[in-house]
Amino acid sequence: MNKRQSQLKFGNEGISLAVPKQSLQECSYMSNLITDRESTFLSYFVPSKDPKMLPVYRFMFQESADLKHCNHKMQAWRFPNEIEAFNDDGEEYSGQKLLNVLRKEDVYGMVVCVRWYGGQLLGPVRFQHITNTAKQSIDKYKSVLEEERKKQLLRTETGLLRQSSSRSSSLLDQRIRQITAKDKTVNLLRKTLNRPLLHEVDYHGKSLEILDMLLQSRNSMISSLRSELQEKNQKDKKKEVNKLEEKMTNAKEPNVNVPSMKASSAISVETPETIESEASVDHKEASKIIKDVEKEE
């Protein structure tokens, strides 16, 4: 099979035409014009991975009014599964050079270089114009892809930032609620111990790190105040017991003026059971306060 036959083989496989969804201008990327001694070169690149669209693209170039008066429409195409071929259209060796550009740039689709002949033979330099315009059209396609990739990356990053900001805002609100509840607990304990209360603070605008530190500080404060309240209750109870013991001791001493039976009947006598009962009441009140604190948390 000679070279000319190999160029035309793909176009003669009888693939049925599909309906194009875009015009030639919409589906292709065009290079800048190169003019040399009145000959003008222009290339188009149509990205595609579907070989069934090849006859459609070739027909679009064939019937384009903008290319009606050009002298050559050199073509090459490359698709997955090693489907590739070219057509010189009278400019010998040009199709192979276009196919080499597709391979080197590692893209799939069709590249077409058109030439308006200016009347002078250009020699080998014409191949530079052919390959340069072809590469330029592919570069434009890659540039658009890169821009789209950057936009997609930016959209993704923006979405992640929004999600992160939303999570961070939610966490900040949670910390503020926790610290506000802790402040109420601290003030309840301080009030019971006759201590000055914490001043009301607006925690909005503080960083998460600061809020975490404040939350840890409030937890330590509550633990310390609880211990102090329990210790105070124990001391109060012990004082009451000592007071009772002192009264019992004084009652046993001699020469104590004993009131008459009538008068003594009006005097309430404190017994160990009475003092214990009163201390128990105080202890229950302290326990209730601690339980209320735990509920506040």
Swiss-Prot record:
Print the keywords alphabetically: Coiled coil
GO CC term (a single one): site of double-strand break
Biased composition (Basic and acidic residues) is annotated at 228-250, 280-297
Query: InterPro entries annotated for this entry?
Result: Impact, Impact_N, Impact_N_sf, Ribosomal_Su5_D2-typ_SF
**Which family does the similarity line name?**
Belongs to the IMPACT family.
What broad taxonomic lineage does this protein's source fall under?
A: Eukaryota, Fungi, Dikarya, Ascomycota, Taphrinomycotina
Q: What is the originating organism of this protein?
A: Schizosaccharomyces pombe (strain 972 / ATCC 24843)
Taking the record's annotation, the residue ranges forming a coiled coil are 225-255
Give the GO terms filed under biological process for this record: GCN2-mediated signaling; regulation of cytoplasmic translational initiation in response to stress
Chain residue ranges for the region called Disordered: 228-297
What protein name does the entry list? IMPACT family member C14C8.09c
